[in-house]
């Protein structure tokens, strides 16, 4: 069996190397370079294993996958920082075909997705693909609360600030921030 983090590393490394098709994984799973990058001395995941992972994107699995970003961020520090700023940014991702959940967005004047990207400095903490026919603030509160909970487990005394543009200004989000001592900009 293969650990989730190793499968994700494998997928990312091969995409970065220009091998975005799943069938490339069957050829390169025995490649010593990729095995070394991932820290394995055995065959990496097959295309069918990766395909099952990509198709099994339940909310629970998505949260587990996203936690890799947060753990990497936390582990990049030798000691807890005094304060951090979580930047929430819904952005357009233009579509050029008939992809699933494709919608026209009047503001962007195009067919697009509206992914939500959360960063802290140069670290990506969450990347959540969403259709564009939704309120840009959809799921922001849920993602913010999960991130704060995860970060506070490791850094209970770190001051957290939520930063976003006015498109994410919702009473539910701001009231939650105030109740949980999270500053917001």
Regions picked out by a protein language model, each given a short descriptive name:
Residues 8-16:
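Short, amphipathic alpha-helical "recognition" segments used to contact nucleic acids or chromatin
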Residues 10-11, 22-25, 46, 50, ...:
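Short, conserved catalytic/metal-binding motifs centered on acidic residues
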Residues 22-37:
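DNA-recognition alpha helix
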Residues 106-155:
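Electropositive, glycine- and tryptophan-enriched low-complexity nucleic-acid-binding patches
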């Amino acid at each position: 069996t293969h650990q989730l983090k190793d499968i994700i590393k494998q997928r990312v490394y091969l995409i970065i190397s220009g091998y975005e098709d799943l069938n490339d994984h069957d050829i390169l799973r025995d490649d010593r370079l990729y095995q070394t990058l991932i820290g394995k001395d055995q065959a990496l995941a097959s295309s069918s294993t990766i395909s099952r992972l990509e198709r099994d994107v339940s909310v629970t699995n998505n949260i587990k996958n996203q936690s890799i970003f947060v753990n990497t961020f936390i582990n990049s520090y030798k000691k807890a920082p005094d304060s951090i700023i979580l930047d929430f940014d819904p952005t357009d991702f233009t579509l050029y075909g008939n992809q699933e959940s494709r919608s026209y967005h009047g503001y962007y004047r195009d067919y697009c997705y509206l992914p939500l990207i959360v960063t802290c400095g140069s670290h990506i903490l969450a990347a959540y693909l969403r259709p564009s026919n939704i309120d840009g603030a959809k799921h922001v509160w849920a993602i913010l609360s999960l991130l704060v909970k995860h970060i506070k487990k490791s850094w209970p005394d770190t001051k957290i600030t939520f930063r976003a543009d006015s498109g994410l200004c919702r009473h539910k989000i701001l009231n939650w921030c105030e109740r949980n001592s999270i500053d917001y900009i």
